[in-house]
Amino acid sequence: LGLARHELGRTVWDERHLCHSPQERLFIDGAWHEGLLPPEDGPALRQQYQRFAARVAQAQRLGFALPTRQARWTPEHATLDAQTFAHWLDQQALTHPRLRWYLDYCCRDDFGADAATVSAWAGLHYFASRHGFHALGDETAEREPVLTWPEGNGWLSARLAEPLREHLHLGRVVLRVTERKHGIDLLAWNEAAGAAERWEARAVVLATPLFVSARLLEQPPDALRVAAGQLHYAPWLTANLALTGELLHRPGAPAAWDNVRYGAASLGYVDARHQSLNPSPRPPLLTAYVALPAARRRDLLEQPWQTWARWVLDDLAPLHPDLAPQLQRIDLCRFGHAMSVPVPGLRGSAALVALGEARGRVLFAHADLAGYSVFEEAYAAGMKTARRVAGGLGLAAG
Ligand SMILES: Cc1cc2nc3c(=O)[nH]c(=O)nc-3n(C[C@H](O)[C@H](O)[C@H](O)COP(=O)(O)OP(=O)(O)OC[C@H]3O[C@@H](n4cnc5c(N)ncnc54)[C@H](O)[C@@H]3O)c2cc1C
């Protein structure tokens, strides 16, 4: 995609796509602070940060990778997978409220659920598969680059799809997938024609969430039935807020790409114009993110948009008391099953492994196969399955 090139053994990223500085800030104790890690309020917190950093370094020696299935799976991993992250942290006496808030935030941001819900494997994977964890001032290596686009990961999927444009049949919702003796029948709803249509295929890759795949297949394999029963999905709400003018400056660090309030129910907001290279001033466009507990899925569906708009504005008000009067337009998007939550036992699920390794004419490729949801996992699942299908059909895979 032209995002990176290799020069003298180093990866050099195209700076237009790297998150511009300042990247993150946290509103705590009445002021903005650079970064999302709460500032130290005494030696007890520093000591806890350092102890957690040491535990993450230990976990890295055990082996964590992104995509996760590139790492080996040992009994130690299984032990971590069998308990919640909160339980594991309690056992380690890592209980400082500021550390726990930060770890909860990371889990809600990446997994859609807090440390009391996700497994200890997931909580450690967040750090150990990437840059580790460093107390303030202890950062050694350069941070891993963050790529971001105003349209989010839609930028990536649009460019990955571009070379295949002629082969894509969009605007169709698959209703049924039936394996026959010599092929596969698909029943799809064609949105433009307003009619159902039948397709025949030699092979099918179900790149749909596993709970959807389980409903599409007339005869889902046992592993799919089991896996679909093990998955828990987090509902999410996003809100795009178009403002009429700049917000008042609060004390501390300047506006960043990601802006979070300590203790908030939401995950804060990103500035959708942060990457803009257009020098002429334009009013802010903010995207707020909310990961809700599964118990609130029905509310998300049933409560009117005004209720959720109010919820978002109330949540952001302590950051920007002048936000509501500046609001020109708000666009809300509800995701009933936004991402699979890595609850205890899920990463080690034999059913997920079996689906990822499935042979035959119907194969599976979705981030769900990793037990949690990030772009890298979706990409890895897609590539792996594409190669297998191509091999089975005697085609070359790119
Ligand atoms: C609000 C939000 C923010 C996120 N932010 C990040 C981030 O910053 N970084 C990151 O790495 N990940 C992020 N994620 C997670 C990321 O979006 C997912 O990991 C990724 O989209 C998974 O890709 P996938 O191809 O496996 O599945 P999906 O993106 O779920 O794609 C499945 C596709 O199947 C289609 N489909 C479903 N049913 C049918 C049917 N019956 N017929 C036809 N098509 C069907 C769907 O429309 C969808 O297009 C975020 C997720 C959310 C919800």
Model-derived regions: residue spans:
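Conserved flavin/dinucleotide-binding core of flavoenzymes
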Residues: 29, 35-37, 183, 189, ...
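Dinucleotide-binding Rossmann-like beta1-alpha1 core, especially the glycine-rich loop
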Residues: 1-61
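Flavin (FAD/FMN)-binding glycine-rich loop and adjacent Rossmann-like elements that form
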Residues: 53-62, 128-132, 142-150, 234, ...
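Active-site/ligand-binding neighborhood in enzyme catalytic cores
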Residues: 64-176, 180-183, 200
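Conserved beta-strand->loop/alpha-helix structural units within folded catalytic cores of enzymes
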Residues: 1, 6, 82, 88, ...
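Central helical "cap/lid" subdomain
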Residues: 172-173, 178-180, 186-254
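Polar, surface-exposed loop/tail segments
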Residues: 7-27, 173-177, 226-229, 255-262, ...
